[in-house]
From Swiss-Prot:
Transmembrane portions of the chain: 23-43, 126-146, 267-287, 321-341
Extracellular compartment residues: 44-125, 288-320
Organism: Bos taurus (Bovine)
Superkingdom of source: Eukaryota
Subcellular localization: Cell membrane; Endoplasmic reticulum membrane
LRR repeats: 397-419, 420-443, 446-465, 468-490, 492-513, 515-536, 543-563, 566-586, 590-611, 613-634, 638-659, 661-682, 684-705, 707-728, 730-751, 753-774, 776-799
GO biological process, one term: protein hexamerization
Protein name: Volume-regulated anion channel subunit LRRC8C
Subunit note: Heterohexamer; oligomerizes with other LRRC8 proteins (LRRC8A, LRRC8B, LRRC8D and/or LRRC8E) to form a heterohexamer. Homoheptamer; inactive, likely because it is not targeted to the plasma membrane in the absence of LRRC8A. In vivo, the subunit composition may depend primarily on expression levels, and heterooligomeric channels containing various proportions of the different LRRC8 proteins may coexist.
Amino acid sequence: MIPVTEFRQFSEQQPAFRVLKPWWDVFTDYLSVAMLMIGVFGCTLQVMQDKIICLPKRVQPSQNQSSVSNVSQAVASTTPLPPPKPSPSNPVTVEMKGLKTDLDLQQYSFINQMCYERALHWYAKYFPYLVLIHTLVFMLCSNFWFKFPGSSSKIEHFISILGKCFDSPWTTRALSEVSGEDSEEKDNRKNNMSRSNTTQSGPEGSLVNSQSLKSIPEKFVVDKSTAGALDKKEGEQAKALFEKVKKFRLHVEEGDILYAMYVRQTVLKVIKFLIIIAYNSALVSKVQFTVDCNVDIQDMTGYKNFSCNHTMAHLFSKLSFCYLCFVSIYGLTCLYTLYWLFYRSLKEYSFEYVRQETGIDDIPDVKNDFAFMLHMIDQYDPLYSKRFAVFLSEVSENKLKQLNLNNEWTPDKLRQKLQTNAHNRLELPLIMLSGLPDTVFEITELQSLKLEIIKNVMIPATIAQLDNLQELSLHQCSVKIHSAALSFLKENLKVLSVKFDDMRELPPWMYGLRNLEELYLVGSLSHDISRNVTLESLRDLKSLKILSIKSNVSKIPQAVVDVSSHLQKMCIHNDGTKLVMLNNLKKMTNLTELELVHCDLERIPHAVFSLLSLQELDLKENNLKSIEEIVSFQHLRKLTVLKLWHNSITYIPEHIKKLTSLERLSFSHNKIEVLPSHLFLCNKIRYLDLSYNDIRFIPPEIGVLQSLQYFSITCNKVESLPDELYFCKKLKTLKIGKNSLSVLSPKIGNLLFLSYLDVKGNHFEILPPELGDCRALKRAGLVVEDALFETLPSDVREQMKTE
């Protein structure tokens, strides 16, 4: 016989699946076991005991004449003979005698089998087997969604993640931290209420006792203690769990196969319950103890009518009623399950209660199969959902990332990355990190902080520890800031650089930095930037002196005009977008430096001539061809630097002689062919760059420039240099490479301060030994072919090689 344990495979599932079995599924499982035992018990009785016992019936002679001759005379009487009555005087000696049928054992077995098959009702015969089959079907229906590949894979994945989330140290840390904060808030509220009842203090006193100020150090202590309990490995495991939960949520929320399958298997169980109740109630009366059997087997047994006893009828009748009770309870439970499935919205799951209890406000609601599984888990233990919700929170994930970040970037490791930037400040560059390490604020000597490609940066109040911080660079970073940190930056920050791809990376809090002196903006703005409200608040930057915008604006923003009264330097790098409507420049009366780079200008803007305080003008990479307007620069008495490089200028007008205050002049990367002698009447020029043009001749008037320190004609077509060039005694840098020069005059020895000389790319055959008189010129400052350098006397070469 098959033992009961062999049927367990029909209802077995992984022990972890129990979290998805609500109380009604557990209850129906126990009912199934009870019904299974009924079926197995009935089948065992069917196999091990006699199913039916039959005896032949005696009939009247008129009805049995054909068979009288085949039986003995003792049984031929028309009425059964009564058994002899024992004598009361001698009861022990009287022998009991019954009716003889003259049938052997084989005939009785044959009669029993024939009557069992022909006369016994099928329900009485197959009742235990029906119970067994129905129970197995119930078990299969209850556990089918645990076995079906389309659903079991999701369930296994979910339970695997759920168990890891439940046991993760990060879950305990996050919930205990929130619990600690909640208790602090309650204590603070009680203290505040008691104090307000006992004393009538002013607003200043109540502010000191407020939670926002008092609880900060307490929370800091909680963070420190809990942070030590989570090592680096556990932090990485928790980080991986967050990623798994995200991917699993996206995958499971797409469909509702689990919900649909559970509903269908429940509906199937209800239908089966109704069928079982219907036919069992109708047929249970067919289980009878006495059965009349009429079979035509006279030729083999001599009898046709038999009276049979169904030996297990009494027990089967009781078992059937018991089975009906179990099935009824099972069915009512399934009906309640259907009510629960259709009455409640199981395709949506709200974490509102968890959000209120834990204080983690950003836990999202879920839907479809994800929601259904969470509803099922709540029937098992709501604590699972509460702990699992921690891994759905971005706030919790950010805290974990912050903790891992702090463990990875220690103060010593950060100090190794310190460097000096272009502003001669001690700078810490952080590129492509998951966040801003809290350990940064332990480097108190930091003067400049540079963040690149870091999303969701939160600048905490601890930035106030950086007493020397003056410069902040944000390149493609979305930044939020604590109110205390903003107050600190308002007072201390001098330089802010922001590089953004969209307006969301342009921090809205930067417009309140009242002590900011330099602002650099790099990113794509709308062409109609004057209507961009995010720039209108620049007027609050009362201390702003330098403003640089590298974008694609079509006109100067009105926000820039709002700070024109104190703006001293403005740079617009326009990436080739034509800049029009420059009349707003006239309002910048205090402007000393102006850069209009790559703005597609064809003429020098007339508005520039109104900037009487202008000292430097840079019109790089425009489309200037004619600069006749240069005569108007004579009104700009303070103009000392003029850069007209990287344009298409073909000639220099003679009016340039009127710019007597010029000290730095750059015409490099143009198409100039002739240098006017009037150029050298600007005798204050110290820096003159004429490289990358088509110049063939240098006028001898260049000797007038006695203040000249830098002169470059690199990449021109000059064939000879005038001797007057060597009258410029203060010349330190001379670049004459990539020309057509064949001889270098020995008078170059007159340039005693010369420290950099580029002669490479000419037709020189020998270098004059007078180069040795240039005591400041060393080998590193002499750009020349190695073979040509060897033409110098050995003592000159040795002199240049010595430092």
